[in-house]
């Protein structure tokens, strides 16, 4: 098909769909806007349904390790060499020898030797080896050599308490194994894996074994029930397909005794009529294995609307399907931070119909892979989350070129770099508990993107204060959200105010009404009668001329869980 005929066909289709009288700007939403709006709703849904990852921290963050200052003692012995034995089972990167070498050339007495051993012991504890000991055997220090023995702390066994439930597989979820070094990080990871299922509670105690350095790990594992039900209600839909959206979710917790999680969620527009409506279905399954987690999420969405055409109403319908395979591994953790590597494979397809006839030029089938790093850092009482990811479009799984590729306008073989960060800082003012929350997202690319991969701002999931019926969309962009929340005297409830700002740019930026939005929000959220709620109102602070939106954007989210 030549570019001329392609342009004529697309122009004819889009003219019928988006040629809307100015007075009814919010009545109908263009297909691109509808698709992006649904992607944001789906992303928010999956984030809400995913259980929060528990943070198990069994030891306090270590103090800064400085150079040892040895005391002056009498009598003392000049130490020329420090010999460490028994450290072979420990990782080679542990700086025990480097710490010990600080004693070279020093004249040490009993206090100095104990100080050296204490510093080495503290470093072992800081790295999680809490039952490994550093000992000084009887020796003659007149030789100038100080001998130190490391007694590795090992696990004799991992057992459940007699009153624990038995429907759990420790081998896959708990990386600490009998016969291996006792590492507190392995235990923390195992407890997080066991408690990733919200209906499970797990804790442990360490009991010394009969042999030196041996320890038994005794776990108490309880599961209240294996299923949960959830229902949701919000007004996050669009006027063209139904503003009020409802949904129901069935969770199966630990169905295969692998600390696994499964859910299926269905929903759609509540005020469904013959001329407009939405339907969505999402399924998810994931399970941990030691420091690894694997999962799969699949979703299907369709919407329909009657669009006013030149010669009568036109029935427009869209369908989309998404499948994501997820694999992650925790690379590093200590008492105050952890870093996770993620790898995703994504597929997406969509079709659009006019009066039950497919618009073939709008058919899309794409695939991509994505790698990323996620980091969490506990800084005193504050929590910092930061992440970076790189996404590359592929031709896997029958993916087809985007129509824009034939004319060099865009490509499904995208290269996208994304950054995200969140900082939450609690503080107290006049005996009142408050917190400041900062969120930041950025997307960068050097390839022209199809609309489904572009960055959008304006709405409850990006720059608040806008109703989401219209957004600014481009290849690149960023937004920042600032909230100050006040924990009300009534437990479980919070009042918050926020100010947001965002910008977009890139290839399509020249065709937009503007490049930036700023908005504000005020709301109250909390939990009552097993229902999480969020009631809010927002107002635009800055927008381009001609960018039409409500002067006041109000909304709500209700999520009930049983």
From Swiss-Prot:
<dbReference type="GO" id="GO:0046930">
    <property type="term" value="C:pore complex"/>
</dbReference>
<keyword id="KW-0812">Transmembrane</keyword>
<keyword id="KW-0472">Membrane</keyword>
<dbReference type="InterPro" id="IPR035251">
    <property type="entry name" value="ShlB_POTRA"/>
</dbReference>
<keyword id="KW-1134">Transmembrane beta strand</keyword>
<keyword id="KW-0813">Transport</keyword>
<dbReference type="GO" id="GO:0006811">
    <property type="term" value="P:monoatomic ion transport"/>
</dbReference>
<dbReference type="InterPro" id="IPR051544">
    <property type="entry name" value="TPS_OM_transporter"/>
</dbReference>
<dbReference type="GO" id="GO:0015288">
    <property type="term" value="F:porin activity"/>
</dbReference>
<dbReference type="InterPro" id="IPR005565">
    <property type="entry name" value="Hemolysn_activator_HlyB_C"/>
</dbReference>
<keyword id="KW-0626">Porin</keyword>
<feature type="domain" description="POTRA">
    <location>
        <begin position="77"/>
        <end position="153"/>
    </location>
</feature>
<dbReference type="GO" id="GO:0046819">
    <property type="term" value="P:protein secretion by the type V secretion system"/>
</dbReference>
<dbReference type="Pfam" id="PF03865">
    <property type="entry name" value="ShlB"/>
</dbReference>
<dbReference type="Pfam" id="PF08479">
    <property type="entry name" value="POTRA_2"/>
</dbReference>
<dbReference type="Pfam" id="PF17287">
    <property type="entry name" value="POTRA_3"/>
</dbReference>
<keyword id="KW-0406">Ion transport</keyword>
<dbReference type="InterPro" id="IPR027282">
    <property type="entry name" value="TPS"/>
</dbReference>
<keyword id="KW-0998">Cell outer membrane</keyword>
<keyword id="KW-0653">Protein transport</keyword>
<comment type="function">
    <text>Probable member of a two partner secretion pathway (TPS) in which it mediates the secretion of CdiA.</text>
</comment>
<dbReference type="GO" id="GO:0008320">
    <property type="term" value="F:protein transmembrane transporter activity"/>
</dbReference>
<comment type="function">
    <text>Potential outer membrane protein component of a toxin-immunity protein module, which functions as a cellular contact-dependent growth inhibition (CDI) system. CDI modules allow bacteria to communicate with and inhibit the growth of closely related neighboring bacteria in a contact-dependent fashion. This protein may be required for secretion and assembly of the CdiA toxin protein.</text>
</comment>
<comment type="similarity">
    <text>Belongs to the TPS (TC 1.B.20) family.</text>
</comment>
<dbReference type="InterPro" id="IPR013686">
    <property type="entry name" value="Polypept-transport_assoc_ShlB"/>
</dbReference>
<dbReference type="InterPro" id="IPR034746">
    <property type="entry name" value="POTRA"/>
</dbReference>
<protein>
    <recommendedName>
        <fullName>Outer membrane transporter CdiB</fullName>
    </recommendedName>
</protein>
<dbReference type="GO" id="GO:0098046">
    <property type="term" value="C:type V protein secretion system complex"/>
</dbReference>
<dbReference type="GO" id="GO:0009279">
    <property type="term" value="C:cell outer membrane"/>
</dbReference>
């Amino acid at each position: 098909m030549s570019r001329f005929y392609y342009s004529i066909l697309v122009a004819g289709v889009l003219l019928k769909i988006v040629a809307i009288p100015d007075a009814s700007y919010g009545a109908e939403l263009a297909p691109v806007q509808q698709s992006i709006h649904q992607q944001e709703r789906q992303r928010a849904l999956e984030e809400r349904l995913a259980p929060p990852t528990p943070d198990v921290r069994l030891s306090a963050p270590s103090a800064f390790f400085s150079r040892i200052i040895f005391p002056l003692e009498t009598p003392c012995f000049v130490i020329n060499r420090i010999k460490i034995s028994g450290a072979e089972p420990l990782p080679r990167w542990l700086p025990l020898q480097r710490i010990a070498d600080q004693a070279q050339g020093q004249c040490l007495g009993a206090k100095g030797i104990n100080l050296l051993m204490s510093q080495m012991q503290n470093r072992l504890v800081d790295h999680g080896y809490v039952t490994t000991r550093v000992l000084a055997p009887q020796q003659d220090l007149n030789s100038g050599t100080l001998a130190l023995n490391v007694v590795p702390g090992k696990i004799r066994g991992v057992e459940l308490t007699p009153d624990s439930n038995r429907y759990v597989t420790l081998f896959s979820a708990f990386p600490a194994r009998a016969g291996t070094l006792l590492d507190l990080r392995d235990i923390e990871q195992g407890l997080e894996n066991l408690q990733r299922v919200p209906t499970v509670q797990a804790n442990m105690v360490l009991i010394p074994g009969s042999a030196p350095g041996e320890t038994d790990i005794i776990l108490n594992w309880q599961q209240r029930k294996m299923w949960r039900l959830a229902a949701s209600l919000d007004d996050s839909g669009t006027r063209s397909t139904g503003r009020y959206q409802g949904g129901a979710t069935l969770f199966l917790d630990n169905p295969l005794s692998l600390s696994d999680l499964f859910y299926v969620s269905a929903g759609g527009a509540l005020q469904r009529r013959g001329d407009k409506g939405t339907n969505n279905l999402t399924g998810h399954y994931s399970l941990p294995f030691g420091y690894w987690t694997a999962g799969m999420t699949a979703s299907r969405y369709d919407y329909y609307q009657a669009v006013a055409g030149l010669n009568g109403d036109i029935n427009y319908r869209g369908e989309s399907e998404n499948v994501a395979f997820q694999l992650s591994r925790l690379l590093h953790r200590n008492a105050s931070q952890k870093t996770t590597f993620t790898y995703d494979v994504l597929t997406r397809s969509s079709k659009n119909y006019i009066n039950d006839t497919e618009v073939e030029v709008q058919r899309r089938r794409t695939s991509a892979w994505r790698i990323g790093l996620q980091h969490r850092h506990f800084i005193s009482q504050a929590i910092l989350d930061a992440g970076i990811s790189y996404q590359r479009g592929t031709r896997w799984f029958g993916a087809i070129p985007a129509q824009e590729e034939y004319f060099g306008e865009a490509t499904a073989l995208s290269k996208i770099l994304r950054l995200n960060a969140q900082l939450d800082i609690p503080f107290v003012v006049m005996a009142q508990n408050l917190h400041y929350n900062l969120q930041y997202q950025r997307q960068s690319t050097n390839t022209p993107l199809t609309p489904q991969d572009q960055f959008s701002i304006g709405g409850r999931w990006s720059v608040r204060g806008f109703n989401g019926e219209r957004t600014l969309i481009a290849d690149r962009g960023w937004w920042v959200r600032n909230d100050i929340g006040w924990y009300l005297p009534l437990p479980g409830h919070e009042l918050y105010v926020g100010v947001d700002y965002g910008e977009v740019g890139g290839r399509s930026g020249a065709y937009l009404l503007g490049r930036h939005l700023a908005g504000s929000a005020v709301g109250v959220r909390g939990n009552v009668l097993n229902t999480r709620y969020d009631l809010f109102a927002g107002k635009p602070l800055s927008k381009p001329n001609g960018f039409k939106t409500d002067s006041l954007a109000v909304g709500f989210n209700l999520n009930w869980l049983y």
